[in-house]
Amino acid sequence: MPRFDVYRNSGEYAEVTPYLLDVQSDLLHGLDTRVVVPLRRRDSFPVVGLPANLTPTFEVEGVECLMETPKLAAVPLRLLKSPIASIASKQFEITAALDFLFHGF
């Protein structure tokens, strides 16, 4: 499962958070979980003062989505079906958001 692949969210909140972004290192392929960050529809995100570098936006299937970095979680592999997109080209922004969450810079 390549890092930065995007999967459909089959969970309860899929209408407002339609996608999950895989942010786990490819070197950890033996685990039965993957660390993901929810990608929430930008138009359903409340207006709050979160730093833009913590919650960058990306377009997936024509939908503008906000990376909800503070809500990252591990999910079982069985919940992640076939990837629908890759946003590996946004690696810098994604990694910067994760660094900001964990290190504050």
Identify the meaning behind each predicted range.
Residues M1-R3, T95:
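Secondary-structure boundary/capping motif
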Residues F58-F105:
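C-terminal terminal-subdomain/extension
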Residues R3-V6, S10, A14-P56:
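Compact nucleic-acid interaction/catalytic patches
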